[in-house]
Amino acid sequence: MKVIMTTKTDLASMNIMEKLVENFGFKETDRLFDGNPVYSKGDTLILTTNDEMIYYDNLDKAIEHQLGLVPEIIVFASRHSSKQKLPALTTHITGNWGNAMYGGKDESLAIAQPSAMKLALLKMNELNDLNWIICYEATHHGPSELNVPSLFIEIGSSEEEWVNDRAGDILAETITYVLDKYRETKFPVAIGIGGGHYAPKQTKRALETDLAFSHIAPKYVHPLKKELILKAIERTAEKVDAIYVDWKGSKGETRQMAKALAEELGLEFIRD
């Protein structure tokens, strides 16, 4: 089963869930997860929890314990917050390149599904009649301790956007599209290194070429350990073909290490 994860603590999450039920045929069942009704359509469930999702390590085990099934993939429908309050629709995988400040464990990465994130990016961009920013975010926050692939798809970046009806519609349609298509869609995959939190060069590459990104390690986490790039490759559900570096957006020792590692592993090295 595929799982769409929502939480009652998050206005954007509830907005997206409402649109999924209204527009995409999800029906309430007699089952409960964390005390909340489970909604179902075909091979997909909508689950709701009562706390912040970024702290829900071992969610896959909780689903197995409560519902008797192991999810194939988990899509977290979430808000995005920023001080700049820029209207945005974003996607990313979770994990921590260093200390775990907001969920997950130190230097631990969730399992990325690059094709799903790229499909989300493309679909959000296609549907974006709001003229909001569409982008990847760098790998950050929890949960990191999941044994199945996952991704966050988010509405940002203030309450005005979180409750925006059209944004909820776009993300509901995006999520259903991604879950329907991701297994049959394959792209060349890269680990992304460098740039800012909103990964502008990686986003541009993904929107304009066939490249899909897995984990993205922004400049603010550099210098980056070689072991963490290896972990990012390991924690990717699809074959990794390349290491991509935003050259000017990376610290010297990290970009040189990444270039050497690509050569060592026989991966394509891509730089912008």
From Swiss-Prot:
The keyword Metal-binding applies. Monomer. It comes from Thermococcus onnurineus (strain NA1). D-aminoacyl-tRNA deacylase with broad substrate specificity. By recycling D-aminoacyl-tRNA to D-amino acids and free tRNA molecules, this enzyme counteracts the toxicity associated with the formation of D-aminoacyl-tRNA entities in vivo. One of its GO terms (biological process) is D-amino acid catabolic process. This is D-aminoacyl-tRNA deacylase. PANTHER family: D-AMINOACYL-TRNA DEACYLASE (PTHR34667:SF1). Pfam families: tRNA_deacylase. GO terms for molecular function: D-aminoacyl-tRNA deacylase activity; zinc ion binding. Keywords: Hydrolase, Metal-binding, Zinc. NCBIfam families: PRK03995.1-6 (NF003074). Gene3D superfamilies: AF0625-like (3.40.630.50). The keyword Membrane does not apply. Its EC number is 3.1.1.96.
